[in-house]
Design a protein with these regions (language model features):
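Active-site and adjacent substrate-binding regions of carbohydrate-active enzymes
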Residues: 318-319
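Aromatic-lined glycan-binding groove of carbohydrate-active enzymes
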Residues: 281-290, 295, 371
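Amphipathic, small/basic residue-rich leader segments at the start of a protein or domain
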Residues: 283, 314-315
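Bacterial N-terminal signal peptides
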Residues: 10-19
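Active-site His/acidic residue clusters
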Residues: 217, 289-314
């Protein structure tokens, strides 16, 4: 790095830290000179549709409204933790085929990876027939997936221009007499997908294999069993789906982040990936939840995050700590592969109630920026439209605040990650090449100060898109002062920016995207 460039980035960091204008001796930073850090996947920002949404079943229950009686805990379920009764509620299958609003909202997020998985996918039975499905799941399974439901998934992914990512059934029903994974269900699902004109782009064998029986795996499932199953999985892929990428291991709840009961016998990623025969993956994956929601507080009394800490640096920085932990494992066990976060959200167990508000949008965008700089290739938000952490409200099918931040990210942030300097103070800055504009640069500026505006000076003319809300707990947001809303058909309004040049005053508690189409950054050509 040249001395001049160090001074330039230092000036930008100082502006971010102080939020005040520096003297004339300090020139504005030039986005055209931001250096390339790394490249991410062109479909970096992705999302999950839980298998339980597709088939219907018991998913995370809504929080009681004021005045409603809270359900009493009942033992059983998640590793014997006494929270089962308050955790789940029956939900009907999502309408991926006929819900025009949902399809239009998803399409606005751009072509991207769509992952259909989750713990419920581990024990789903694919009824590969046009005859009526069984009234109850076959032995060893917990739910039934019909051809019509899967056809809806494939059609949805086609409609939004996505790449389909899945995991396969691995419960007792999907195993032979000796307990080894049987690829028959995977083979059938893949064949039917191809028959429909679809394609499974990538697959994890198991959703969260380190969680064992908590996620539907046989009791006593260990690293040796995982290695054995992964060998069968690779043989299946090579023979039946040679273009499909193997993703894994897909672990969660490590690096000091407690999101599962301590008594379930978690199998560390180190053990999973070092067992013989050594599991081989094309893409290394993990899940990141910085904590658990109130639904699962009984798992660990020290877990959870209060809403007044939502904008704190130590909360946001957990993403870096987790990424560092898993990048070390990637280098050790799958060097040279891309790394994906195949699930992430505000908190595990459906998210806290405030995950649905403006308050969590800061984490959403900050995490995308941090993990891109860390070299994570794809980040799958959990979920598109289920529970409190969803981008879209499952009851109204209307966008939540983070959805609008996601749309602007999809439209503006390209796949070349740039160095906008180190975050300092309450203003966090992340930059990537401007999508679809050779030489252009996009910058997102997150003002975490809830009381004071921040100042930012960058050279060149830009178009600015500033998101704000009336308060942190708002369920709606404004773009450059105008409230954002969609029609009943889910078609988005025209998201118009405003001209920006020179020193910019960024409102308190705001997220601003700035597009510099004429930056002439050589890394972006």
């Amino acid at each position: 790095m040249t001395k001049g460039r160090m001074l330039m980035l230092g000036s930008l960091s100082l502006l971010a830290m102080t939020g005040v204008t520096l003297g004339a001796a300090t020139p504005p930073a030039d986005p055209g000179r931001f250096a390339q850090v790394v490249k991410v996947d062109d479909q970096y920002q992705a999302y999950n549709v839980e298998m339980v949404e597709v088939v219907g079943g018991r998913f995370w229950a809504p929080y009681p409204k004021p005045g409603e009686a809270r359900p009493q805990p009942a033992a059983g379920g998640s590793g014997g933790v006494d929270i089962a009764a308050v955790m789940f509620r029956k939900r009907e299958p999502i309408d991926l085929t006929g819900d025009t609003r949902l399809r239009n909202l998803a399409r606005a997020l751009g072509p991207t990876h769509v992952r259909v998985s989750g713990g419920w996918a581990n024990a789903v039975y694919f009824h590969d027939s046009d005859t009526p499905p069984p009234a109850t799941p076959p032995r060893g399974y917990q739910s039934v997936l019909t051809r019509a439901q899967w056809a809806g998934v494939v059609d949805f992914v086609k409609t939004v221009g996505g790449k389909l990512v899945v995991s396969f059934p691995v419960s007792d029903g999907a195993r032979d007499a000796s307990g080894v994974w049987d690829p028959d269900q995977a083979r059938r699902l893949n064949a039917y997908t191809e028959k429909l004109g679809g394609h499974i782009y990538a697959a994890e064998l198991i959703n969260e294999p380190n969680a064992g029986s908590m996620v539907g795996l046989p009791k006593g499932y260990d690293a040796a069993a995982f290695a054995r199953d992964m060998a069968v999985f690779r043989a299946f892929r090579d023979a039946d789906a040679p273009q499909m990428k193997i993703v894994g291991p897909g672990s969660t709840g490590e690096a000091g982040f407690v999101i599962m009961p301590r008594n379930i016998g978690v199998v560390p990623t180190d053990a999973l990936m070092s067992a013989e025969p050594r599991p081989r993956v094309d893409i290394f994956s993990y899940h990141f939840y910085g904590t658990v929601s109130k639904r699962c507080a009984a798992m660990d009394k020290s877990a959870g995050i209060s809403p007044d800490r939502a904008l704190d640096e130590d909360w946001l920085a957990r993403a870096d700590l987790n990424a560092t932990y898993y990048k070390e494992r990637q280098q050790r066990f799958a060097s040279g592969t891309d790394i994906w976060i195949t699930e992430t959200a505000q908190a595990a167990c459906g998210g806290d109630a405030w995950a649905a508000t403006w308050r969590d949008s800061f984490r959403y965008v900050d995490q995308l920026g941090r993990q891109a700089k860390q070299g994570v290739s794809v980040v799958f938000h959990n979920t598109l439209a289920a529970s409190d952490y969803a981008l879209i409200d499952e009851a109204t099918m209307m966008p939540r605040p983070s959805y609008w931040a996601a749309v602007l990210w999809a439209r503006l942030m390209g796949n070349v990650v740039l160095d906008a300097g180190q975050n300092a103070g309450k203003l966090h800055l992340y930059s990537q090449c401007l999508r679809g504009t050779p030489g252009g640069v996009a910058l997102v500026a997150i003002n975490l100060d809830t009381a004071n505006p921040a100042s930012l000076s960058l050279a060149g003319k830009a178009t600015r898109y500033t998101l704000t809300a009336d308060n942190l707990d708002a369920g709606s947001v404004k773009l450059n002062g105008q409230t954002l809303a969609v029609g009943q058909d889910g078609v988005l309004p025209n998201l118009k920016g405003v001209a920006a040049h020179g020193m910019q005053s960024l409102p308190a508690a705001s997220i601003s995207y700035l597009a510099y189409p004429d930056a002439r950054n050589p890394a972006c050509r």
